């Protein structure tokens, strides 16, 4: 078994959301079963930006992203959470 890396796209509710404060909120929302590896802001369209988070999970624990997705979706200012990629590293 190994480590699972998941790239997760977090979409803010609007273009008015401060991306730096959203990044801090996402960092604090990472569950104990996961480790935040990287985070970046990606422009989408018309001034809207997405937060891309790479999270590492233990494959022995199932490697599922549901707990992380649920935690991220509860953060204030988050419109949606979508897993873009999952793979073993």
Swiss-Prot record:
HAMAP family: EF1_beta. This is Elongation factor 1-beta. The keyword Protein biosynthesis applies. Keywords: Elongation factor, Protein biosynthesis. Belongs to the EF-1-beta/EF-1-delta family. It comes from the Archaea. Promotes the exchange of GDP for GTP in EF-1-alpha/GDP, thus allowing the regeneration of EF-1-alpha/GTP that could then be used to form the ternary complex EF-1-alpha/GTP/AAtRNA. Transmembrane segments: none annotated. It comes from Methanothrix thermoacetophila (strain DSM 6194 / JCM 14653 / NBRC 101360 / PT) (Methanosaeta thermophila). Signal peptide: none annotated. One of its GO terms (molecular function) is translation elongation factor activity. It holds the Pfam family EF1_GNE. InterPro entries: eEF-1beta-like_sf (IPR036219), EF1B_bsu/dsu_GNE (IPR014038), Transl_elong_EF1B/ribsomal_bS6 (IPR014717), Transl_elong_EF1B_B_arc (IPR004542). The lineage of its organism: Archaea, Methanobacteriati, Methanobacteriota, Stenosarchaea group, Methanomicrobia.
